[in-house]
Amino acid sequence: MQIHRLPAFSDNYIFVLHDPGQNIAAVVDPADPQPVLKKLAELGAELVAIFNTHHHSDHVGGNRTLLQAFPNTVVYGGEQDRGRIPGQQHFLKEGDQVSFAHRRAEVYFVPGHTRAHIAYYFPPTTGEEWGELFCGDTLFAGGCGRLFEGTPAQMVDSLSKLRNLPETTRVWCAHEYTLKNLQFALTVDSDNSHLKNRFKQVQNARNLSQPTVPSDIGLEKQTNPFLRWDQPHLIIHTKSNTPVQCFARLRGMKDQF
């Protein structure tokens, strides 16, 4: 399975998954149909599936146009997004699986950013080291999504699921927010040498207009404060009594950053 990262709008990423053997493709969160149609034409591939993580327009905005171009495409989304994702035919819940390119993705229910958000995790195949996580706006490189419909406790539970994935899991998040996320992270975790090194690397990459996605779970566990809410120094820094309170205060600080 080949993964093509397509930039869209000011900071979105769309991911086209390609199976060269069958010459079929799937797309994750097609915000804008045009770059997807262009990539499919370049590949000469037929679109067979749309994997949506949640209902926001900058993730599902291309669904209808892509369905017009490829009427047999199957649209997947979360069970609780019924009626909110254009063209949705499959309503997924925790523990479900979806198939593409002779691989099966495990579905995780990860509410917080929205009440219905899901993520897709492709475990590594035999002989491969890396798994692939498509997590929409739940986990970002260096950050996490705002809480529009969920609670801090829900988001901590959701991020815990993703944090528990193998460290050799690539994180394909849907926005190029990494530099600003790490700028915030340094204000609350300034003694973190891994974080300082990562910030320099990301700063250099963005100065060259290079993408910083994908990340990986191992790196996020070292440097992302929103996966480190149970670290004693962050609990102390935020004057919190519990990990969930620490997360909530970190999220509130980031919202004002």
Curated annotation (Swiss-Prot):
The Swiss-Prot or TrEMBL record annotates one GO molecular function as: metal ion binding
Pathway listed for it is: Secondary metabolite metabolism; methylglyoxal degradation; (R)-lactate from methylglyoxal: step 2/2
Q: Give the cofactor note.
A: Binds 2 Zn(2+) ions per subunit.
In the record, biological process GO terms are: methylglyoxal catabolic process to D-lactate via S-lactoyl-glutathione
Q: List the disulfide bonds.
A: none
Keyword Membrane belongs to the record:
no
Keyword Transit peptide listed: no
Kindly list the cofactors needed: Zn(2+)
Recorded hits in SMART domains, A to Z, give: Lactamase_B (SM00849)
Stretches assigned to coiled coil:
none
Highest taxon above the source species: Bacteria
Which positions in this protein are listed as binding Zn(2+) 1?
Answer: 54, 56, 113, 137
Write out the transmembrane intervals. none
Q: Which Gene3D superfamilies match?
A: Ribonuclease Z/Hydroxyacylglutathione hydrolase-like (3.60.15.10)
Which keywords describe this protein according to UniProt?
Hydrolase, Metal-binding, Zinc
* Binding-site residues, Zn(2+) 2: 58-59, 137, 175
In short, the EC number is 3.1.2.6
Q: Which Pfam families match?
A: HAGH_C, Lactamase_B
Catalytic activity, reaction form = an S-(2-hydroxyacyl)glutathione + H2O = a 2-hydroxy carboxylate + glutathione + H(+)
**NCBIfam families per record:** GSH_gloB
The role this protein plays is: Thiolesterase that catalyzes the hydrolysis of S-D-lactoyl-glutathione to form glutathione and D-lactic acid.
User: What quaternary structure, including any partners, is listed in this protein's UniProt entry?
Assistant: Monomer.
UniProt record similarity statement: Belongs to the metallo-beta-lactamase superfamily. Glyoxalase II family.
| Protein's recorded name | Hydroxyacylglutathione hydrolase
The source organism is: Acaryochloris marina (strain MBIC 11017)
